Swiss-Prot record:
One biological process term in Gene Ontology: translation
Name of the gene encoding the protein in the UniProt record: rplC
Subunit organization: Part of the 50S ribosomal subunit. Forms a cluster with proteins L14 and L19.
Name this protein carries in UniProt: Large ribosomal subunit protein uL3
Residues covered by region (Disordered): 113-143
Lineage: Bacteria, Bacillati, Bacillota, Bacilli, Lactobacillales
Described purpose of this protein according to its UniProt entry: One of the primary rRNA binding proteins, it binds directly near the 3'-end of the 23S rRNA, where it nucleates assembly of the 50S subunit.
Length: 220
């Protein structure tokens, strides 16, 4: 079973632990989410809890969004996401709120976000290729290089100029350093995908017990 919450990336800072260790953390605003819909295996083919985060003015939302929010007795939301096979309580129902207290300090989580978009970029910036000689006699400066000996064909996976960033990425096994229930904030060790003020999804780690299980097997 999975527990999760939606949030907004605020930025990065650093905190000291009780041992005096300086830890870089990402601050994530997890203002209580509203349960917009509860999906069941019988009605929808899978079980999930749909959460809504960050209020949006009704002027900026269409009629279906307003009607969907009205069923949960709340305002339209900017960010809506699903938590599959959610473990948020047996009596969870539409209109309930999910807050930061579902997590505890020391837990590991997986954070999913959208990376920064860089637009159309060349190979040097996008893929980290080396440039050619910059002398006047050189005809190769910042080109992608040879496409191979076969004419009229580009091999699959060839690194060429194109769009960079703006992809959905998940960083796994990040530790929660602090849970601030009063301010609805999570402090997560390390960095997470996306720019400041971008939306993220936080779920309990799928690999939380991998190292422990492997160590037990090796000891046997």
């Amino acid at each position: 079973m999975t527990k999760g919450i939606l949030g907004k990336k605020v930025g990065m800072t650093q905190v000291f632990t009780d041992n005096g260790e300086l830890v870089p953390v990402t601050v994530i605003d997890v203002t209580p989410n509203v349960v917009m819909q509860v999906k069941t295996l019988e009605n929808d083919g899978y079980s999930a809890v749909q959460l809504g985060f960050d209020d949006k003015r009704e002027v900026l939302s269409n009629k279906p969004e307003q009607g969907h929010a009205a069923k949960a007795n709340t305002t339209p939301k900017r960010f809506i996401g699903e938590i599959r096979d959610a473990e948020l309580g047996d009596d969870i129902k539409v209109g309930d709120k999910v807050a930061a207290d579902i997590f505890a300090e020391g837990e590991t989580v997986d954070v999913t976000g959208t990376t920064k978009g860089h637009g159309y970029q060349g190979n040097i910036h996008k893929d980290g290729q080396r440039r050619g000689p910059m002398a006047h006699g050189s005809r190769y400066h910042r080109r992608p290089g040879s496409l191979g000996a076969i004419i009229n064909h580009v091999f699959k996976g060839k690194k060429l100029p194109g769009r960079m960033g703006n992809n959905t990425r998940t960083v796994q096994h990040l530790r929660i350093v602090k849970v601030d229930t009063e301010n609805n904030v999570l402090l997560i060790k390390g960095n997470v995908p996306g720019a400041n003020k971008s939306f993220v999804t936080i779920k309990n780690s799928v690999k939380a017990n991998t190292k422990k299980s492997l160590s037990k097997q090796s000891n046997k």
